[in-house]
């Protein structure tokens, strides 16, 4: 089974439910709302999902990775459906997939660009940990030594690569201290 084929997912479309960043700036007087798709795996799966900064420590199906508030009603200016994936940006998010027993560990260093991708990647590996260095205040080097990933991925908006590191604030994306 290929976990990443479209037919493996139930797709729910929220019609005219979303304004992106540019749409919010232009307002509904100038742009039309967009459709937004919410995908759920059709295959058996069970995930242990943890976001320490939000007090989330849950076991369940893929739906636990979605923030129900963001999908509860239309609010073009106060809600952002992309924040519905993975409860938006958090310093650390951990996944343990109980259906995959391969002993593999992936560490993802990310910005908000990866929020939509990460839950789906968690379906194909036993352990996945996500760090957003813009919010993470610990030592990434120490964290990596303790987590011992098999691979480290950096998933970020291309504009993140252009920004200089602010060594004073400890909030720059590439501040890997």
Annotate each language-model stretch with its function.
Residues 1-177:
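Extracellular glycan-modifying ectodomains
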């Amino acid at each position: 089974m290929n976990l990443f084929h479209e037919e493996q997912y139930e797709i729910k479309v929220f019609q005219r439910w979303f304004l992106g960043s540019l749409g919010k700036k232009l307002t509904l007087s100038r742009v039309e709302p967009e459709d937004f798709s919410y995908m759920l795996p059709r295959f058996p799966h069970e995930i242990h999902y943890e976001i320490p900064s939000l007090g989330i420590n849950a076991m369940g199906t893929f739906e636990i990775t979605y923030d129900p508030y963001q999908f509860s009603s239309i609010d073009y200016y106060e809600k952002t459906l992309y924040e519905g994936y993975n409860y938006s940006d958090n310093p650390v998010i951990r996944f343990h997939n109980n259906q995959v027993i391969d002993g593999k560990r992936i560490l993802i260093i990310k910005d908000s660009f990866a929020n939509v991708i990460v839950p789906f990647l968690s379906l194909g590996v036993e352990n996945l940990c996500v760090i957003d260095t813009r919010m993470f205040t610990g030592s990434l080097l120490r964290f990596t030594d303790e987590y011992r990933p098999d691979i480290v991925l950096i998933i970020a908006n291309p504009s993140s690569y252009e920004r200089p590191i602010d060594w004073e604030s400890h909030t720059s994306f590439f501040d890997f201290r």
